[in-house]
Design a protein with these regions (language model features):
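Nucleotide-activated chemistry modules centered on ATP-dependent adenylation/adenylyltransferase
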Residues: 1-355
């Protein structure tokens, strides 16, 4: 959030009657504990969603309960409904780390709809942009989710105006992303902390309205859900990082990483951040990144992007070793024939035996 947005949130909080307001900056912690591993794993839920909101809920819960214990609070509250995933993510961590603190959930307990919430705020003189209030918008480092009446259906798209970032630029622009051991450390040769680079990339790419989609998935409670999102930096970073990995990692590293990364993303999505197996996944993912360094070139265009290519000292696509589909320099034709003959043995045996 910008300083202006944070000030506006604080103003609204006092307008609604809070006694004290506290803003907790946990962006660096969020990156180090979660986002970094989502990048290492190229995590996209159902090959679509970069876990923009579900990824941050665990860190929010951890930071909230830490603050609640610091001030010796007897109660902690959250605004989740009784129909979604967030109630599980918050309650699970609150119950686990502070069972003595009572959880208050007014929206869940009173079965309040979004429209009822809006009417309550209007009746109490709270001023908001009500055209926007009809959408549930969750903004964070790794993207923004958008939910509304359209996403409660299986066929309606979100209208253009529902997306926070609108198309501002139409001229194509190429950017250079620099990775060091799997982490994004520079955008257009300007080095910075990884989470700052993500923010910088998002600022550039959001002007092209990149990263929009609608995710359909299974909730923790067992029902299908649909949510819109925009995540320019997340989608670009994941795709750029994945291409760099394709050039650097072995085929077995890539294959084993893929299914372990999916499990990591699934556990995180379902509120299981505190499960010890997550630390095991993270250790594997971190180990896989020791050679993943280099530059990736990305072209930004209206509503989409293209990954152009990579430059890395660790690139295994070595033309001195051989050129795919063209020529080789390390083996003879007879050696190739002998390899294929031996390689085919198990298939030949099956075909000869199972007639």
């Amino acid at each position: 959030f910008t300083e202006l947005e944070i000030k506006d949130i604080e103003s609204k909080a006092y307008q609604m009657g809070v006694k004290t307001y506290q803003n907790i900056d946990a962006v660096e912690s969020y990156y180090q504990k979660v986002v970094k591993f989502l990048i290492f794993g190229n995590v996209l839920k159902n090959n679509t969603y970069p876990l923009s909101v579900s990824a941050e809920r665990s860190i929010q819960a951890l930071e909230i309960i830490k603050y609640a214990k610091k001030i010796n609070a007897d109660y902690v509250a959250h605004g989740s409904t009784g129909a979604g995933n967030d109630q599980v993510r918050f309650d699970l961590i609150f119950q686990t780390l502070a069972p003595e603190i009572k959880i208050i959930t007014p929206i869940r307990d009173q079965h309040l709809s979004r429209q009822e919430e809006i009417q309550f705020l209007i009746a109490n003189g709270i001023e908001l942009t009500w055209s926007k209030a009809k959408y549930s918008i969750n903004k964070g480092l790794w993207g923004t989710s958008i939910g509304g009446q359209e996403t409660l259906t299986s066929h309606l798209p979100l209208p253009e105006e529902a997306y926070p970032s609108q198309l501002q630029k139409k001229d194509e622009q190429q950017v250079q992303l620099t990775f060091s051991k799997g982490e994004l450390v520079a955008v257009n040769k300007e080095q910075d902390l990884p989470h700052k680079c993500i923010e910088k990339l998002n600022k550039l790419a959001s002007k092209y309205a990149i990263g929009r989609d609608i995710h359909v998935g299974d909730t923790i409670l067992g029902i299908k859900g649909r949510v819109g999102f925009e995540a320019a930096a997340a989608t670009i970073t994941i795709k750029a990082h994945h291409l760099l990995e394709k050039h650097i990692l072995t085929k077995w590293q890539l294959q084993h990483k893929e299914y372990l990364s999916n499990w990591y993303g699934t556990h995180l999505h379902e509120g299981l951040f505190l499960d010890p197996v997550m630390r095991d996944f993270e250790a594997f993912l971190e180990s896989s990144q020791t050679q993943v360094s280099g530059h990736v070139y990305v072209s930004l265009k209206p509503y989409h992007f293209a990954i152009d290519g990579v430059v890395s000292e660790n690139d295994l696509m070595d033309t001195d070793f051989g050129t795919y589909g063209e020529e080789n320099k390390r083996w003879t034709a007879d050696e190739a024939k002998g390899f294929i003959k031996i390689y085919a043995n198990h298939i030949k045996r099956v075909k000869q035996t199972h007639r």
